[in-house]
Amino acid sequence: MGNTDDVKAVKPEKLSSPPPPAAPDQSNSHVYPDWAAMQAYYGPRVALPPYFNPAVASGQSPHPYMWGPPQPVMPPYGVPYAALYAHGGVYAHPGVPLAASPMSMDTHAKSSGTNEHGLIKKLKGHDDLAMSIGNGKADSSEGEMERTLSQSKETEGSSDGSNENSKRAAVNGRKRGRDEAPNMIGEVKIETQSSVIPSPRAKSEKLLGITVATPMVAGKVVGTVVSPSMTSSLELKDSPKEHAVNSPAGGQQPSTMMPNDSWLHNDRDLKRERRKQSNRESARRSRLRKQAEAEELAIKVDSLTAENMALKAEINRLTLTAEKLTNDNSRLLEVMKNAQAERAADVGLGNNNEKKASTLSTANLLSRVDNAGSGDRDEGESDVYEKTTKSGAKLHQLLDANPRTDAVAAG
C-alpha cells in the first residue's frame, strides 16, 4: 500500500512539470547562402521578389528561381526561359499550399508532444473532459506515460514482488489499451460527422492555441480512412516538425473523385444520342439510295413506255398499209380476171367470123361452078361436062369436110 501512495503522490509532480521550451523559430534563417551570386546574376537594379522559406507557413510569394516573372535579360536567340530549374528538382518547394486532405477529415494541427501534454492538463482542469486532439495521439501518449510511471514506482518500491507487480501492470496496460481503442474510434467518428458551422468548443480551442481544421466534404473520396488507434504508435515516433506546417486558409489538396451518377448518366445519354444519330444517318442514306433507285426506275419506265407507244403507232401504220395493199391486190386480181375473160371472148368471136367467111367463099365458088355447067353445050362438050361434074363433086367433098375429120382420117 505504501507503494501505491507514493505513486499517487509522484504522478501530479511529474505531469505538472513545466514543458521544455519549444523549438526555435527558423523563419528568419537564411536558406540560400549564394545570395551574392544571385544578386550578381540579376543585377543591382532589378527588384527581386521575396524568397520562399520552407520553415514559414505557405502564403508568401515563391522564390525567383522557380516562379519569378521573366527578367529583362536579352538572350541572343528566342525568348528567355521562365524557370531555371525543374519543379521540385533542386529546391523541393511545394507547388500548392499544404492543406488537409478530405480523405482524413479529422486531421488537426499538431504541436510538440510536451506542449500537447500541458494543454491536455489545462483542458481537463476546465471541463473535466478529455478532448481528442489531432488523431488521438495525446490520449495514447498520456496512457503510456501513466503506465511507465506506475511500473517504475512499483519496481523501485517493492523488492520481493517486483516481477508480479510488473506482470500485473502489463496486463492492466493491455486492458486499458483495449478499452481506449473503441473510445478513440468513437471520437474519430463523431469528429468526422461534425458540421461546417464552428462551435463554441472550437472557439475555446482556438483561444488556447489549438487550430482545428474544419472538415468539408466535396464528394465521394476514393481511399480507406485509417482509424487513429491503428496509427497512434507510429505517429508517436514521428518528428513533430513534420506536422507543424498547416494551411492558414484551410485549403484542400485535390483528391481523386469517383464519377458521379449524373456523369455516368450523361455518358450513357451521350452514347445513346450517338447511336441514334448514326442510325438516323444510315436510315437517311438508305432512304436517299432507294429514292435514287426509284427515280432511275421511273425514268426507265417512262422511256420504255414512250418506246412502246412508238412501236404501237408503227405497228398500226404497217397494219393499215398491209390492208391497203391487200385491197389493191384483190382489185388488181379482179381486173386481171375481167381482162382475161374479155380476151377469151374476143378470141372466140374472131374464130367464128373466120369460119363464116370461109363457108361463104366456098359456097360462092360452088355456085359459080354449078352455074358455069348449066349453059349451052354440045355433044363434044358433054364429055367434058361429065368430067367437070365429077371434079365438082370432089370439090364439094373437100370443101364440106372438117379439118379434124381429115386429120382423123389421115391418121
UniProtKB/Swiss-Prot annotation:
Compartments in which it is found:
Nucleus
InterPro entries, per database record: bZIP, bZIP_plant_GBF1, bZIP_sf, GBF-like, MFMR
Upregulation: By light.
Q: Where is the composition biased (Basic and acidic residues)?
A: 1-14, 235-244, 264-293
Per the record, the similarity remark reads: Belongs to the bZIP family.
Q: How does it assemble?
A: Binds DNA as a dimer.
Tell me what this protein is called. Common plant regulatory factor 1
Query: What taxonomic lineage is listed for the species of origin?
Result: Eukaryota, Viridiplantae, Streptophyta, Embryophyta, Tracheophyta
Gene encoding this chain?
Answer: CPRF1
